[in-house]
């Protein structure tokens, strides 16, 4: 990879997940200066927060991000959320272009009568798992019920069992 000569354009990329990082990479390759904004404390998006720990151990997302930032012409500002402390109109006024790669912002809530402590959505639970230095600090019950049928549900079930849940349904 070699960066093209300075193009004289500055681009804002909102979201430091796979799409935002890929966009920043291609823009930097063409000689554009890129500022990536992300609401989370670390970049990487679902690669950092959404892949179960048993599937991708270590800091692979941060290693990739560190490599990307060494290319030149790319900076990242974490903890900046679009619409709160980062107005879209301001970005449009300060940059030649804005690329929105905001990704998944939430999950569907399950309405369960009598819900109590211990009920968590799988996306947040997997995120907590990925960010925990000691996986045994992440709470898991002896009997775990996972509601859902996608890969996130499978990841939550497998990770629960790996952490010592006696029964996972």
Regions found by a protein language model. Name each.
Residues 1-35, 39-40, 47-55, 65, ...:
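Fe-S ferredoxin-like electron-transfer domains
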Residues 43-47, 56, 61, 156-157:
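Long, contiguous hydrophobic alpha-helical segments, chiefly transmembrane helices and signal peptides
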Residues 12-37, 77-87, 92, 106-108, ...:
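Rossmann-like dinucleotide/flavin-binding elements
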Residues 50-77, 113-129, 135:
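N-terminal glycine-rich dinucleotide-binding loop that anchors FAD/FMN and/or NAD(P) in oxidoreductases
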Residues 47-48, 64-97:
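Conserved N-terminal/central alpha/beta ligand/cofactor-binding core
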Residues 3-6, 70, 90-93, 112, ...:
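Solvent-exposed alpha-helices and their adjacent loops that cap or buttress functional pockets
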